[in-house]
A protein has these predicted regions:
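N-terminal single-pass transmembrane signal-anchor helix
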Residues: 2-34
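Glutamine-centric residue-chemistry signal
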Residues: 5, 14, 54-55, 114
């Protein structure tokens, strides 16, 4: 009488390895896109917060411009990093930003691993809450629905 061996054959093991590899090849790119999309909220949150701060300055001092003396104007300085550091918030003209006494355009420029988010690229907002992006994706995809 033959005794039956316990365990898996090499073919069974290789079948499992192939299935795991196929699942990983589908899941990893989807996960990376999810992480980029989730990190985008860092830019949106920071842009909205800073736009609100500039609006409060405008309400109080009738100007969006920076002044180190709080009694003479707004003290919100740029550039600065977003809360989690995935973006640098700028008003620099080289990235499409602007800040004058009567208007502003804040631009969130991706930093570090977030630069791979080429679909949305730079996100921006201005004094009338007009939102924009520099990538190829739609505005709704980048800023939310």
């Amino acid at each position: 009488m033959r005794t039956r061996q316990a365990g898996m054959s090499l073919i069974e093991l290789m079948t499992v390895v192939v299935i795991v590899a196929i699942l990983a090849s589908l899941a990893i790119p989807a996960y990376r896109q999810y992480v980029l999309r989730a990190n985008r909220t860092d830019a949106k949150t920071s842009l909205m917060f800073l736009a609100g701060a500039l609006e409060r300055c405008y309400t109080r001092y009738n100007s969006y411009t920076y002044d180190t003396n709080a009694s003479l104007g707004c003290t919100v300085a740029f550039p600065q990093n977003s809360e989690n550091g995935y973006y640098s918030i700028m008003t620099d003209g080289s990235v499409g930003g602007k800040r004058t006494a009567s208007e502003f355009n804040l631009v969130a420029v991706p930093q570090g691993g977030q630069v791979k988010d080429t679909g949305c690229g730079n996100l921006s907002i201005d004094q009338v809450n007009t939102k924009a992006k520099s990538g190829s994706k739609s505005l709704a995809e980048c800023w939310g629905r």
